[in-house]
Design a protein with these regions (language model features):
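Structural motif
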Residues: 16-20, 31, 80
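A generic local secondary-structure boundary/capping motif
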Residues: 21-25, 160
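Active-site phosphate-binding and catalytic loops of NTP-dependent enzymes
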Residues: 11-20, 58-63
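RNA pseudouridine synthases
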Residues: 24-38, 43-76
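Conserved small/polar residues in nucleotide/adenosyl-binding loops
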Residues: 1-5
Length: 185
């Protein structure tokens, strides 16, 4: 143990010893939050994440306290800003490529599939002429929480902003059904 500490103090230890860690908790009024991190110091990151939860009216919980409210899915987004994708043809192509479900919304087509198949499904759809915007694994909530209290809405927005601004945070997943007229951007 002392050799490792001396080596680290002398600058000889690996400088890029990063590890994945996941923190779970609740935001204001019980909004479920999962925070995926990549850190070189788990204790520092845990303290920072706990601080954000506490500061903005939530609390960090134990592992597994909210992950049962989410399902890991492959999510592929296709560009449909021009509205030129035919829904019937898209359904046929998506199912043929291996997609499970899809929906048209706000200038995009969002497809869900098994997370291990997302890249393959996206590649197949790209070959068929669809413009793939993204294809990644996401934690998709099974239920959503709506906040009606203005203070809760403000605190939830600030919590998400603080988490996303942290350099160690890779992804933030939540089940907040955020209001449409979001002025954060």
């Amino acid at each position: 143990m002392y050799k490792r500490q001396l080596k680290k103090a002398a600058g000889g230890a690996e400088k890029n010893d990063y590890e994945d860690c996941v923190y779970e908790g609740y935001g204001p009024n019980g909004v479920a939050v999962i925070v995926e991190c990549l850190t070189d110091n788990r204790n520092r990151t845990a303290g920072e994440i706990r601080h954000y939860f506490d500061k903005f009216g939530g609390n960090m919980g134990a592992t597994g306290c909210v992950d049962f409210l989410f399902t890991l899915k492959g999510v592929i987004v296709l560009d449909n800003e021009d509205g030129d994708i035919d829904e019937d043809k898209a359904m046929e192509d998506i199912l043929e490529a291996g997609g499970d479900d899809f929906g048209f919304e706000d200038g995009v087509v969002e497809i869900t599939t098994d997370p291990s198949a997302a890249a393959t499904v996206a590649e197949e759809l790209g070959k068929k002429g669809y413009k793939v915007v993204s294809a990644e694994a996401e934690q998709v909530p099974s239920t959503y929480t709506t906040l009606t209290d203005e203070d809760h809405i403000k605190k939830m927005g600030l919590l998400l902003e603080a988490l996303e601004d942290n350099d160690d945070v890779q992804n933030v997943w939540h089940n907040w059904d955020a209001p449409e007229s979001d002025d954060e951007d």
